[in-house]
Amino acid sequence: YMLELKNLVFSVTLKDEKNNDQKIDIIKGINFTFEKGKFYAITGPNGSGKTTMAKLIMGINRQTSGHIFFEGRDISDLSITERAKLGISYSFQHPARFKGITFRDLLAIAGQTEDEEKLLGIVRRMGICPLSFLDKPVDATLSGGEIKKIELATTIARNPKLAIYDEPDTG
């Protein structure tokens, strides 16, 4: 399997109305395998744990218990950076905006290339007009849809083994 979740649990501790600690399970005992080369969509209502599960897989949050296996290797205790080096990539629901950096700069960093044709190819795959968009600054002047396309394009540019897209159609 590409990815396997075994008894995955994520809990938080909150204070109740009497200021006592109360443990709440956000993710409770998930077992699932993801096969290589397939596309999976995880759906559910707001607050059902979709983003939490994505962040657990990427290592942004740490599971309370259970294990995450990537290509047969237990990655449960690996950092975000170590998981990224293994080929896991995460596209945020609300991407960051940067002052003083262009879309071209971000793509070159993500794709580890400054080859104009490769960058233009990635931009075209996103349905973006490359000539007018490539040198735009990635800042507050961009719409939500534009910043989301930039986020998705940089994920594609990294050419990951496993890409996790959190709400790819928002923005």
Model-found features: residue ranges?
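The feature captures the beta-strand-to-loop junction immediately N-terminal to the Walker
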Residues: 43-45
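Helix-to-loop junction immediately C-terminal to a conserved catalytic motif
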Residues: 58
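Catalytic Walker B motif of ABC-type/P-loop ATPase nucleotide-binding domains
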Residues: 163-167
